[in-house]
Amino acid sequence: MNIFAAFEERIGEALATLTRAGQLPEGLDLGRVVVEPPRDPGHGDLATNAALVLAKEARTNPKALAELLAAELRQDPRVTEASVAGPGFLNLRLAPEVFAEVVRAALASGEAFGRGARRPGLVNVEYVSANPTGPMHVGHGRGAVFGDALANLLAASGREVVREYYINDAGAQVDVLARSAYLRYREALGDAIGAIPEGLYPGDYLKPVGRRLAETHGRALLREPESAWLPVVRDFAIAAMMDLIRDDLAALGIRHDVFFSERTLQGGGDGGAVGALIAELREKGLVYVGRLPPPKGQLPEDWEDRDQTLFRSTAFGDDIDRPLLKSDGTYTYFASDIAYHASKVARGATDLIDVLGADHGGYVKRMQAAVRAVSDGRASLDVKLCQLVRLLRGGEPVKMSKRAGEFVTLREVIDEVGRDPVRFMMLYRKNDATLDFDLAKVVEQSKDNPVFYVQYAHARTASVFRQAREAFPGEDLSPQALAGADLSLLRDSGEADIMRLVAQYPRVIEAAGSAHEPHRLAFYLYELASAFHSFWNKGKDLPQLRFVNQTDRKSTLSRLALVAALRGVLASGLGILGVTAPDEMR
């Protein structure tokens, strides 16, 4: 039950009534009408921008239109107050029974509460896609958690989702990996390798790879020229690194449906899938040979003063056309990326989401242009950029890892603080804002630690039910039974706050999913937990407000119904974020 969607529909009906009465013109576009919680809860339970966005089209001023709507909505028995604020916002206050009905719906629906109906179209979410050259670092972890939670959120909002990892196994970096692993192979055989040469990967994580190479090949590779041993070592090292990455992802509870190899795009004759894609774009008139003018300011890496094979990305909103071939005749990264995204479209994706590091900002327009081109406008791409993570301990920067050589590994952080703090705190800030992750603060047991505060609320709901079972042995305390409780007894402002927040859950799922912003759900869960803790504390001072009162069965069952609804929402929301909902805090 989504009261926000219900009142969007009700406002549409009210506008239709006003149109039939001749007070508004026909054909108003309601696409921008929104019903949401007011910024100040003191203004009401719902707010709508309908008058503001429709006034021009309706040839009237926003306040006058808002007053017309308010008069119409006051006739709805669910509305106890309709008031106009500011330039034309319409605020509604609803009857308590509306929220009681939401609580009953939450109890009856169980895990389905807040979930959206299945919608058409396939969403492909690509996330992590870390180069297979070493263990994952904390920055990778942020993108991994964001992508995984976003995929969960989209599924909860009714979308069919494919979770994908792109293995960058065809670039120069994997040759560097092979040479680095070969050095560790020689070391495992007893060679003195000295300092790791500049340009190779220095971390200790390649020592086990070198040992396994020695166990598998003995000294045979030492007798081979680089042209012979490099592909052997490269394949071996890539497989070892992907095993390492998969282990790191599993430790964080991250899953993928598809691992897509870049190499598969370049195999076969005529340049493989990349060559075929360029030929297809050429037939559409979207590939030509030309010379790019020098851009103003700093020259980008892919600009060269020569005739080049170019993609007409400006035809789809990009700033400049983009090269597809390097001067040595090999494909640019962009060419491979176009072919890869064309593969996603060919596999049925209509909505593509790439979760990337903040350093990929220049990539966005060109790839959005490419997706529009290869899909003939049937698919779209949203690129979500994840900013840096600053790792701190008690406010001080954390030193690099010896194992990784240049950074702190994700696994080290998970092993120290646990999966739940990593996941929740990675989502408790918008993805495009730099995140300070303090290893000391995320394990504090205080209100200032959001993951503890939300999980503690869920654990407290479990303790309420343990207490209730002791006080009322044999009482059916299932959600289905509690749905029959007399919710009109929930008259305290703290109870009303919790009911309003429970009612917002379906809209939070819908809005956060549409915006591709899982942090909204994390913020909401903290607000819901805060309302619950506040009412819990009220009961310490006022015994009549305690959740369990052995001398007042009716009030107890009413409050237990509210707690059960809240508990279900906390568990559901934490599940979408990939965080556990504990019954006890240890």
UniProtKB/Swiss-Prot annotation:
SMART domains documented for this protein: Arg_tRNA_synt_N, DALR_1
Name a GO molecular-function annotation.
ATP binding
Q: Does the keyword ATP-binding apply?
A: yes
Q: Which Pfam families match?
A: Arg_tRNA_synt_N (PF03485), DALR_1 (PF05746), tRNA-synt_1d (PF00750)
Give the enzyme's main class according to its UniProt record, as a single word: ligase
Supply the InterPro entries for this chain. Answer: aa-tRNA-synth_I_CS, Arg-tRNA-ligase, Arg-tRNA-synth_N, Arg-tRNA-synth_N_sf, ArgRS_core, DALR_anticod-bd, Rossmann-like_a/b/a_fold, tRNAsynth_Ia_anticodon-bd
Question: What keywords are assigned to this protein?
Answer: Aminoacyl-tRNA synthetase, ATP-binding, Cytoplasm, Ligase, Nucleotide-binding, Protein biosynthesis
Q: Which Gene3D superfamilies match?
A: Arginyl tRNA synthetase N-terminal domain, HUPs, Isoleucyl-tRNA Synthetase, Domain 1
| Compartmental location | Cytoplasm
Q: Which GO terms describe its biological process?
A: arginyl-tRNA aminoacylation
**Residue ranges for motif 'HIGH' region?**
130-140
| SUPFAM superfamilies on file | Anticodon-binding domain of a subclass of class I aminoacyl-tRNA synthetases, Arginyl-tRNA synthetase (ArgRS), N-terminal 'additional' domain, Nucleotidylyl transferase
The EC number of this protein is 6.1.1.19
| UniProt cross-references to NCBIfam families, sorted A to Z | argS
> Which proteins does it associate with, and in what oligomeric form?
Monomer.
- What is the name attached to this protein's record? Arginine--tRNA ligase
Q: Which gene encodes it?
A: argS
